[in-house]
């Protein structure tokens, strides 16, 4: 539920499960970002929700993180799905749908992550497996509306699909 509908509470739960606490997980996130060459990124939360001036990134750094994530088969499998179902420990079943408006509406386009806060605006990191066989990542940040985010992303990915 973290990558398909973008549930922020799932990010916190995963952080606590993996590292025992959110601060410890955020420290790991920042270490990994540095290893990936993200020079203009500092995380303060595992879910991207505004956390003051200590939480920031750039489109370039998000693209680096997306390229790394795309190499993981499980990530590729998840972000290609339009919906998912999970069963809780007490047996309740929950179905959720993607927040990626392009998934299923634009050929060879897959999601990676949607986001929105008042500070960041409407954001999306997506990708296309272009006709030339290459994979291109797009990052849109600061969209004034959700529709603007999708229009900008569509234009970027359509352009990438024309590259030779």
Region spans (language model):
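Signal peptide-directed extracytoplasmic domains
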Residues: 1-4, 27
